[in-house]
Amino acid sequence: MLVSISNFPATARPQAGLSFAPYVFEFSITEGQDRFLATFYGQYPEPETPFTGDCEVRTGAFKPTETLLGNRVWLDSNKNGLQDPGENGIGGICVNLYDEQGNLLQTTTTDTNGYYGFNLEKGQIYSLEFVKPANLAFTDRNTGNDNLDSDADPVTGKTTPITIDKDTLSWDAGLYPNDSFVSPTPDIKNGPKPQVGPVRSGRLLYAYIDGFFQNSCLIDAFASPEVLVKIPHCSFVSHEDSGGGSMLEIDRLKAIAEDNMRHMTSRPFNYTSNVFSDEVPTGGLPASQINVFFANLNQSGWSYDPLYQAYLRYVDTADKNNPGVLHADTDRLTGRQLHFENVIVVMADTDVVSPTNLDIHLDEGDGGYAYLFRDGQMIPIKWSTKAGEYEKLTGLRRPIQFLNNDGSPAVLRPGHTWVLIVTPFSLVQVQQPGVYLIRYAAPEGESR
């Protein structure tokens, strides 16, 4: 499913559903504004009222200064002691750090996604204590994979001694509701509603993306006449300016997807065009921060957080009195901060059809330069929609492919990917060590 999601006016934010999208494409819609096309497959978006602990929820990206110790506190819904897909983190859990003699050294808390961390001196021995709320219980510990299981004693919440000789990001704690737990009461008026969006009008770019996500189904809020005849649709929502656009009910999204699937059962498709691995590629340049500038009142940023091994997203408020002041960007469905394992800057040729209508070329057979940000580093790569051996053999298209300069597959980190599309003459600049500026350059004739 492809859904056109608004970013302007600023009342569209925070959007609902972006954290569930394997790929999000961001691009200019002229006049200094941008829009997103979110892909949904493999998992439907769902609203959530998150569990929280008794402590303050930590905010901001974790900044490493020494050797790291940390990871995540999560809700172990099935009580199997392992972090399974769909089991989310718990914010506001206090975590205490002790030295070898049992003296309390530091205290921190988990953030909205359940992550915590400490900067520590290498070669020392420490232990942790997770402080659970009264209505939650610890799951069994050491039930399997060290990166996925719980390490907290089910009675005390404490860990065994930990010797720090390198970054150690595998000390987790699983919690589940005990007999005294009462589910949070949904806030009917202000709580998350089962909707995605806001949904706005279609753009010419969507025809190209729909083409390489074969059997996909595009939903938008109509489009200008010259665009409407060129892009495929399987459904529309009403066009509304208030609140940044109309919201799409998740039940309707599911019904449209199921109807589309019934019509496509005889048509094969394959979305595995890229390579993913936890192993960090060599040769990248440090990139802890990405600053994105479309216009003075349209700025955003990405901060690398080593606890997540992903980039946390930040946005402005389009406030002329406070331009460029960023805050955490969250998903309206969950209240959790958006984080993406891969941020890719794609440089694509752009034609100006009219001052407010761009044709951004991701056509079949195209390609160009790109920049991959993953694991706190930047790697120059290329993008391609050209047919490879698979496409030539089967006649089927696959999604946009990311390649190293020698033509081998660029390796992405498993997880979600944010694709920022800019013109070939946009600025990609190192502002200071580890900090990149992506400044959009409008083609001649684009309304600013």
Features from the language model and the residues they span:
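A short, Gly/Thr-enriched small/hydrophobic beta-strand-prone motif that recurs across taxa
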Residues: 64-82, 94, 171-172
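Surface-exposed loops/turns
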Residues: 112, 122-123
